[in-house]
């Protein structure tokens, strides 16, 4: 299985473990990294059985006000699902802004539309006070940027 996540999530790690939705833990290897500016990474795990996948959406169709869901592991609370809306689309920096709670431990996880399609990869929160609490400004990398990354890594035939 190939896992898409944020490169800062694995930055500096000697060993990388991926835990799936059912609690199984797999050793992962890095297939490709797209630097800190884009903050994307592809990991490879070797499960004994087929993994469920989440379909990619089209981030060009994302609209301000649309409902979104973020999945992550904030502060170690595994499998957390939060909801919100798209607050803004920053075309200059290439980010989707949302008020869905994205806290430490959520980055690298999917931002989903109401159809359950991945429209972004949760990246960070904006917090001018420099504490680690979410103030309602979460940022995600649009999935179309990730699709370009996957194509450039010549792995698109292995992914859905």
State what each model feature region is.
Residues 56-63, 76, 80, 106, ...:
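Soluble non-cytosolic domains of exported or imported proteins
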Residues 28-31, 86, 111:
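Conserved hydrophobic positions within beta-strands
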Residues 101-122:
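Catalytic nucleophile loop of clan PA
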Residues 1-72, 76-79, 93-97, 156-159:
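Conserved active-site neighborhood of the chymotrypsin/trypsin-like protease fold
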Residues 85-86, 91:
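Short proline/glycine- and basic residue-enriched helix-capping loop/turn segments at helix->loop/beta transitions
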Residues 7, 40, 62, 68, ...:
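Extracytoplasmic/secreted envelope proteins and their assembly/folding machinery
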């Amino acid at each position: 299985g190939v896992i898409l996540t944020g490169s800062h999530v694995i930055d500096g790690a000697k060993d990388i473990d991926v835990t799936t939705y059912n609690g199984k833990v797999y050793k992962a290897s890095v297939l490709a990294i797209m630097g800190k500016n884009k903050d994307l990474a592809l990991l490879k795990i070797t499960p004994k059985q087929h993994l469920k996948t989440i379909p990619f959406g089209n981030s060009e169709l994302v609209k301000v006000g649309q409902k979104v869901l973020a999945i992550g592991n904030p502060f170690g609370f595994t499998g957390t699902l939060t909801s919100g809306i798209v607050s803004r689309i920053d075309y200059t920096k290439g980010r989707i802004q949302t008020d869905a709670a994205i806290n430490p431990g959520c980055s690298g996880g999917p931002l989903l539309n109401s159809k359950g399609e991945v429209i972004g990869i949760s990246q960070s929160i904006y917090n001018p006070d420099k504490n680690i609490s979410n103030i309602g400004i979460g940022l995600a990398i649009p999935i179309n940027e990730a699709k370009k990354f996957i194509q450039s890594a010549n792995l698109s035939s292995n992914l859905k």
